[in-house]
């Protein structure tokens, strides 16, 4: 049971870290297709989506 709590605490601490590589660029958008060419210019890959009116790119 102690091992379970130890693993649980470690999981909670690791989940609080921001391990994602996502990049918010300062480009307004209405839909994800608008972000693809802007992400290609910004980070070199056309992988992204529109979230809350801003483009979010994934390297």
From Swiss-Prot:
Keyword Disulfide bond in the entry? The reply is: yes
| PROSITE patterns, alphabetized | SCORP_SHORT_TOXIN (PS01138)
Please, which domain of life does this record's source organism belong to? Eukaryota
Q: Which parts of this chain are annotated as the region Interaction with Ca(2+)-activated K(+) channels?
A: 48-55
One Gene Ontology molecular-function label: ion channel inhibitor activity
- Localization in the cell: Secreted
Q: Name one Pfam family in it.
A: Toxin_2
Q: Which GO terms describe its cellular component?
A: extracellular region
- Please provide the record's keywords in A-Z order: Disulfide bond, Ion channel impairing toxin, Neurotoxin, Potassium channel impairing toxin, Secreted, Signal, Toxin, Voltage-gated potassium channel impairing toxin
Question: What S-S linkages are listed for this chain?
Answer: 29-50, 35-55, 39-57
Site label Basic residue of the functional dyad, positions? 49
According to UniProt, where does the site described as Aromatic residue of the functional dyad lie? 58
Quote the tissue specificity entry: Expressed by the venom gland.
- Per the UniProt entry, the signal peptide is 1-22
Q: Does the keyword ATP-binding apply?
A: no
The job of this chain, per UniProt, is described as: Inhibits with low potency Kv1.1/KCNA1, Kv1.2/KCNA2, Kv1.3/KCNA3 and Kv11.1/KCNH2/ERG1 voltage-gated potassium channels.
The UniProt similarity line reads: Belongs to the short scorpion toxin superfamily. Potassium channel inhibitor family. Alpha-KTx 04 subfamily.
Entry domain remark? Has the structural arrangement of an alpha-helix connected to antiparallel beta-sheets by disulfide bonds (CS-alpha/beta).
Protein name stated in the entry? Potassium channel toxin alpha-KTx 4.5
* Source organism of the structure: Tityus costatus (Brazilian scorpion)
